[in-house]
Amino acid sequence: MNTFICSALICLSWLPGFIQARVLTKKLTITYAKGAPDGIERDMIFINGQFPGPDLIFDEGDDVVINVVNDMPFNTTVHWHGLLMQGTPWSDGVPGLTQKPIEPGESFVYRFKAEPAGTYWYHSHSRATLLDGLYGALWIRPKENVPMPFTMISNSSDDLSAMERAAKNPQLLIVSDWSNFTSWQYIQGLVASELDIFCVDSILLNGKGSSYCPGQRLLESELSAYMNYAFGGANITDKGCFPFVESTEGPYLPGNQSAIPDHMWKDCVLGNGSNETIYVDPEEKWVSLNIVMASTMKSVVFSIDEHDLWLYELDGQLIEPIKYQWVTMLPSKRYSVLVKLNKTPGDYTIRLPDQGFSQIISGFATFSYKGGQDIGQTTPWVTYGGQNASDQGNGSGLTDLLPAPFPALRPRNTSDVFFVYNLYRWNAAYTWSLTGAAAMPVDDWAYQPLLYNPNSTAAHDKSLVIRTKYGQWVDLILQVGSKPDERQEINHVIHKHSSRAWQVGSGSGIWNYTSVDEAATLHPELFNFENPPYMDVFATSFEGPSWLIMRYQVTNPGPWLLHCHSEIHLAGGMAGVIMDGVDRWPTIPPAYAPNATGHYPLV
């Protein structure tokens, strides 16, 4: 190990951005073995022998060196979700774009600058193996004296000191959904049935949870009037899974339900897993819970009985704080909340239901005060099905969480170029297109990454690829509901690799403007150029045809993925490529040449 560190220090001088900074080295060994997070055993992925993987904590500006060893029987890569990767596109971890897969028995060294500060995560980006457990939390501690927005919460000096302490020492939490089927089995179920299956067995917190099978009567009582109407009288299953109807499958029915594996969609199996306990000390007065939403397909409502949540960071970006009683968390996003520890010391239930638009299911955990006593049942903010349980509660929804960044960050008022993406199903219920022109095949360019082939035919494929120039301001317009036979599109969560973007506008209907400037002039009420949200994951609406606009500046040349972070949608082709800054394509160091793996020669 000492030799490895020495070699890295010697060679870092010629890598962009790796000069005169602390170098931190980590080793992640990925294995495939039996495990039972919710009490039901299956094959799954472990990182350094644990699930989820170990928390990775760095200081802002650290130079990070991570040796990923693949001891699984199949290939993989690791993506560092939300990190900028300025000048290091070869470490973004996307097969076919920035690297070749890490084959069984081989390793790959990722090198990058720890920036920007905030809450992130790392996960697989090969096929759909996120379903198998390859993920972990990542936190970058901000530099000293960074302004924090806590005076918007309280003016008390005691509160402010406690909140600052809490933010510097957060508890990292990972919320995820879990299926008792491997990713291969799940995808085979989609293909064989020709149906879009989005059903899981449990909701986990820090890799712990269970399946509950509460009974048909309770499950049906939790359905909203909207969902009952959408189902047209069809019933949900005893797992809380939704029926195969036009509102869930589009025009691609009937499919072949008999090809769905037993227990994947119905016939609930009761688990015997254990739930997580989060311990807090009331003498600290406040705690920061930095939550990674590592789900593969579910949006989950997070709440702590009888406690308020002050959301102060979203997707790693500080925001003007918002007080909620529950927060709806979308796949791949990160939510940091401050919780005041002023209740009677005891155990309070953390509730983690699906938000009610894809399954009736819930997970649970315990929020436990040090020195607490038995206080009995605590009062919930939300129900098992994610519905409001109290007239006093207030929470965020699927698409209405659009906070202002802190401090204010403004994009340019105009852009240089815009691209329209039409998001919809692609010739089947379980395949998808991001661009509206093609579905992106899984691992299609895996062994010919576009980083090394920026002028190839694939890199000029306009059905999947856009090309920009350095310094341009770019608008990405995400349109849903544009297919005449499927006006009501499923909600999508779109992640942009590398730099964040501003959501500068959104509206209903079909985008039919010649420019964003024209749309903003005609409908100024639909746009925000003063303090728009600044994020790396964006949520489209499911309420009929609608559009939203992501704006960013090209400052980091490379091949970056734009994709839906529902894992089954990504596996079904919902992705595209942004070839940013093609006029200033990066020079690739020898350690990351086409057949290299990031290792330096030992000296």
Curated annotation (Swiss-Prot):
Biotechnology remark: A mixture of dinapinones A1 and A2 at a ratio of 1:1 or 1:2 leads to inhibition of triacylglycerol accumulation in mammalian cells, suggesting that these compounds might be interresting to treat obesity. This inhibitory activity is mostly provided by dinapinone A2 but is potentiated by dinapinone A1. Dinapinones do not affect diacylglycerol acyltransferase (DGAT) activity but enhance neutral lipid degradation together with induction of autophagy.
Domain named Plastocyanin-like: residues: 30-144, 173-353, 450-581
Gene3D superfamilies the record matches: Cupredoxins - blue copper proteins (2.60.40.420)
Q: Which residues bind Cu cation 3?
A: 125
Task: Name a Pfam family for this protein.
Answer: Cu-oxidase_3
Which reaction equations make up its catalytic activity?
A: 4 monapinone A + O2 = 2 dinapinone A + 2 H2O; 4 monapinone E + O2 = 2 dinapinone E + 2 H2O
Q: Which residues carry a glycan?
A: 75, 155, 180, 235, 256, 272, 275, 388, 394, 413, 455, 512, 595
Task: Indicate the temperature dependence noted in the record.
Answer: Optimum temperature is 50 degrees Celsius.
The record's pH note reads: Optimum pH is 4.0.
Q: Which residues form a coiled coil?
A: none
Give the EC number(s) under which this enzyme is classified.
Answer: 1.-.-.-
Pathway where it operates: Secondary metabolite biosynthesis
Q: Which residues bind Cu cation 2?
A: 81, 123
Q: Which keywords accompany this UniProt record?
A: Copper, Glycoprotein, Metal-binding, Oxidoreductase, Repeat, Signal
What this protein is reported to do is described as: Multicopper oxidase; part of the gene cluster that mediates the biosynthesis of dinapinones DPA1 (or (M)-DPA) and DPA2 (or (P)-DPA), biaryl dihydronaphthopyranones that act in concert as inhibitors of triacylglycerol accumulation in mammalian cells. The first step in the pathway corresponds to the biosynthesis of dihydroxy-decanoyl-CoA by the fungal type I fatty acid synthase (formed by ORF4 and ORF5).
Which PANTHER family does the protein's record reference? LACCASE-RELATED, MULTI-COPPER OXIDASE
Q: Which family does it belong to?
A: Belongs to the multicopper oxidase family.
List the protein's name: Multicopper oxidase MCE
Whose protein is this, by species?
A: Talaromyces pinophilus
